[in-house]
Each structure stands twice: as C-alpha cells, then as structure tokens.
C-alpha cells in the first residue's frame, strides 16, 4: 500500500533537515506520496522529484504578535495540507515545535491522522534542560503515536531529562550510498592546491561552541609537526572568527583552508584522509557516516551517539572531550601507517553498509508507518 506522508523538518543544512529530506526522497522513490510542509524549500530538494510536493509555511507579521507566529502558521498549514491531501501520517522532526504543531493540526481537522516524531538531539539535550519547556516537550512526545530517536544515547537522555511516559524506538540516521562513496579526487586536490603527498583532514560543522572546533585546530597544529597535511574546515557559524584568529595565532594559515558552507560535501569527503568530530555533545554525528561511506576513518569524542557510529580501533578512534594530544597521537599513528589507514577506511565503509545503509533504515521507517496505521482488530491497513 502506498502512503501519503507529510514531512516537517527544518529546511537547513543541519542533520535533522538532511535526514528528513533524504527520507522523503527515498520514500518517494518507493512510490509513496510525500508532502514537505516547511518554512522554506529543503536545500536537498534541488530538482524536480516525482511523488514529492512542497507546501511553504508563510509566516506573516501582525502588530498583535510581538514575534512572527511560526508555530501557529505551521500548525494551520499542516491541518490544511493533511485535510486536502488526505494524508495518512505526519512525520515531524523535532519534538518542539514540530510535534506540538502536528498535535494542534490533528485536533483542528478531527481526523485519525497518525503522528510520528523523530528526536534528533537539540530538542532534548538543549531544550529539554530548560524547565520552562520541559513539560511541553514531554507533552509533544506523549501525544505522538510513535516516537523514534537517532541513537540509544538520545533515548537515555530523553528519559533522564524529560521523563516521558512513552516508548521510544532507535532508528539510526542513514546516507545515500549513491552520493557518498570512495572515488579518485586527484583533480579536485589539484584545484585546491593540495599536493599528492599531503594528507587531508576535514571537519564539517555549524561552528557553534558545542562543536569545539578549537580542539580540531589545536589537534591539527600538533599533527602537522609530524605529518605533511592540510585541514579543510567546512561550515560557518558563531565561532568562525574565533577559529580564524586561532589559526593565525598558531601560525598554520598556510595549512588550513576555510571553505565556508558547502551544500554538497561528498567530493570533499572522498578527497579526505581523516575526519575529526570533537564535539562536547553529539546525538549522532551524521557527518561521520558520510565520511565513513567514502572510506574515510574518523576520530570522534566519546559522547552521545558517536560511540554507536565509530567502533574504536576498527572504523576509527574515540577520545575524551578536550584531549587534543590524544587526538593528535591517534591521527599521526593512522596517517603514518598506510596499511592501517587503508584497512580502517575499508572497515568504515563496510560498517556503513551493514548498519546505516539507506535501504535498511528507510525500510525500518516504512514498517513503523504500516504498523501505526494497522487496525488492531482485523490486522488490515
């Protein structure tokens, strides 16, 4: 049975927006009718896709409201689209505001549409720590028909911080193997002025404090004393200027390339030798999957969902938050040992295929959809 599914996510380059959009694209390929209900066109919807429809949430400014009422506009648009298109499911990414908006939409139309909510991290680890929002998050979770989270770690944090009376299933993030794969990037290296002998380290993030980009730079400054290497810093955000100054202070400007925001990073990853993700909080770490699919070993911090992605000593290394010396030592060992690097990169690719391939994860979501729609009495959808 083909389903009609509404998907709401942030249309930006963050992990939740990427996963929500890629999930919709994969479901559409399977013949389901997908309706994106978002404040802007998701950046991964960069062409016309069969079975995919976009409904923009327009937020008007009224003098009676101190701030533009995004939540109300979204709930209204959800109800409108769900009723007109006869949607079976609203799949929302983030407990607040999206699960709350879905609940309001369901109450407005009075129909038996099902709500699936996926927790991604910030909605729990940051917002869940705010006492003024805690009850609201719990309500959004408990009013959803099914709740998933992107890691076991996030489920544990949800129960610890929010304490919902709700079962939560782990459904890992995934990547499209047709986009992220190992390939020869010799020409691209030349275009960036990187020689064949130089190793390439890469970090991709939104440059917020929680990502600890300064640790990436500090570790790299130690690494280049032993290894001829370049560091690609991909992204932008509040800490960008601070990191720029740090690079200057460490006198490694000629070793670091600031590439800014990049919508499509697959080629940059395929060109790289090592990924560094040294966050102090990370519910999953989608960029790790993207790198591993390209045969790139990763070094990550032992926090949140990262240990569920990186198998220490097998597909990469884990370190403690702030241990830049440990990161540097592991990186130097790996980059100097060609056989170790090659074997670890291959095992990283195999791990992605075994645990995080799109076919497997999208099928898990399909099963969730069918189960939640199944009639308890006669077993029919």
Curated annotation (Swiss-Prot):
<comment type="similarity">
    <text>Belongs to the glycosyltransferase group 1 family. Glycosyltransferase 4 subfamily.</text>
</comment>
<feature type="binding site">
    <location>
        <position position="262"/>
    </location>
    <ligand>
        <name>UDP</name>
    </ligand>
</feature>
<dbReference type="GO" id="GO:0071793">
    <property type="term" value="P:bacillithiol biosynthetic process"/>
</dbReference>
<feature type="binding site">
    <location>
        <position position="94"/>
    </location>
    <ligand>
        <name>(S)-malate</name>
    </ligand>
</feature>
<keyword id="KW-0547">Nucleotide-binding</keyword>
<dbReference type="InterPro" id="IPR023881">
    <property type="entry name" value="Thiol_BshA"/>
</dbReference>
<dbReference type="InterPro" id="IPR001296">
    <property type="entry name" value="Glyco_trans_1"/>
</dbReference>
<dbReference type="InterPro" id="IPR050194">
    <property type="entry name" value="Glycosyltransferase_grp1"/>
</dbReference>
<dbReference type="InterPro" id="IPR028098">
    <property type="entry name" value="Glyco_trans_4-like_N"/>
</dbReference>
<dbReference type="Pfam" id="PF00534">
    <property type="entry name" value="Glycos_transf_1"/>
</dbReference>
<dbReference type="GO" id="GO:0016757">
    <property type="term" value="F:glycosyltransferase activity"/>
</dbReference>
<comment type="function">
    <text>Involved in bacillithiol (BSH) biosynthesis. Catalyzes the first step of the pathway, the formation of N-acetylglucosaminylmalate (GlcNAc-Mal) from UDP-N-acetylglucosamine (UDP-GlcNAc) and L-malate.</text>
</comment>
<keyword id="KW-0808">Transferase</keyword>
<dbReference type="GO" id="GO:0000166">
    <property type="term" value="F:nucleotide binding"/>
</dbReference>
<feature type="binding site">
    <location>
        <position position="206"/>
    </location>
    <ligand>
        <name>UDP</name>
    </ligand>
</feature>
<keyword id="KW-0328">Glycosyltransferase</keyword>
<protein>
    <recommendedName>
        <fullName>N-acetyl-alpha-D-glucosaminyl L-malate synthase</fullName>
        <ecNumber>2.4.1.-</ecNumber>
    </recommendedName>
</protein>
<feature type="binding site">
    <location>
        <position position="122"/>
    </location>
    <ligand>
        <name>(S)-malate</name>
    </ligand>
</feature>
<feature type="binding site">
    <location>
        <position position="290"/>
    </location>
    <ligand>
        <name>UDP</name>
    </ligand>
</feature>
<comment type="subunit">
    <text>Dimer of tetramers.</text>
</comment>
<dbReference type="Pfam" id="PF13439">
    <property type="entry name" value="Glyco_transf_4"/>
</dbReference>
<feature type="binding site">
    <location>
        <position position="16"/>
    </location>
    <ligand>
        <name>(S)-malate</name>
    </ligand>
</feature>
């Amino acid at each position: 049975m083909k389903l009609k599914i509404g998907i709401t996510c942030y249309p930006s380059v963050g992990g939740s927006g990427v996963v929500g959009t890629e999930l919709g694209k994969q479901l559409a390929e399977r013949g389901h009718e997908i309706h994106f209900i978002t404040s802007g066109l998701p950046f991964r919807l960069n062409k016309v896709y069969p079975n995919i429809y976009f409904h923009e949430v327009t937020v008007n400014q009224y003098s009676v409201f101190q701030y533009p009422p995004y939540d109300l506009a979204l709930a209204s648009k959800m109800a409108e689209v769900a009723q007109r298109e006869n949607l079976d499911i609203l799949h929302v990414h983030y407990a607040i505001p999206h699960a709350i908006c879905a609940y309001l939409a369901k109450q407005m139309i009075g129909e038996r549409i099902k709500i699936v909510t996926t927790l991604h991290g910030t909605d729990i680890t940051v917002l869940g720590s705010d006492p003024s929002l805690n009850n609201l998050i719990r309500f959004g979770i408990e009013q959803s028909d099914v709740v998933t989270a992107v890691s076991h770690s996030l489920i544990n944090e949800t129960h610890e911080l929010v304490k919902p009376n709700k079962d939560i299933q782990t459904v890992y993030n995934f990547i499209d193997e047709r986009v992220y794969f190992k390939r020869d990037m010799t020409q691209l290296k030349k275009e960036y002025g990187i020689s064949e002998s130089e190793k390439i380290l890469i970090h991709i993030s939104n440059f917020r404090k929680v990502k600890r980009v300064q640790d990436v730079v500090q570790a790299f400054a130690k690494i280049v004393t032993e290894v001829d290497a370049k560091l690609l810093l991909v992204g932008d955000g509040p800490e960008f200027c601070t990191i720029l100054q740090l690079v200057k202070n460490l006198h490694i400007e000629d070793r670091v390339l600031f590439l800014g925001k990049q919508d499509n990073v697959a080629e940059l990853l395929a060109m790289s030798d090592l990924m560094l993700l040294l966050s102090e909080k990370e519910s999953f770490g989608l960029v790790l999957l993207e790198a591993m699919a390209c045969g790139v070993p990763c070094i990550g911090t032992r926090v949140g969902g990262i240990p569920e992605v990186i198998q220490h000593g097998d597909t990469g290394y884990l370190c403690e938050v702030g241990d830049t010396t440990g990161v540097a030592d592991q990186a130097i060992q790996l980059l100097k040992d060609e056989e170790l690097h090659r074997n670890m990169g291959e095992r990283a690719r195999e791990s992605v295929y075994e645990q995080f391939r799109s076919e497997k994860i999208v099928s898990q979501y399909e099963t969730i959809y069918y189960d939640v729609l199944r009639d308890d009495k006669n077993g029919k959808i």
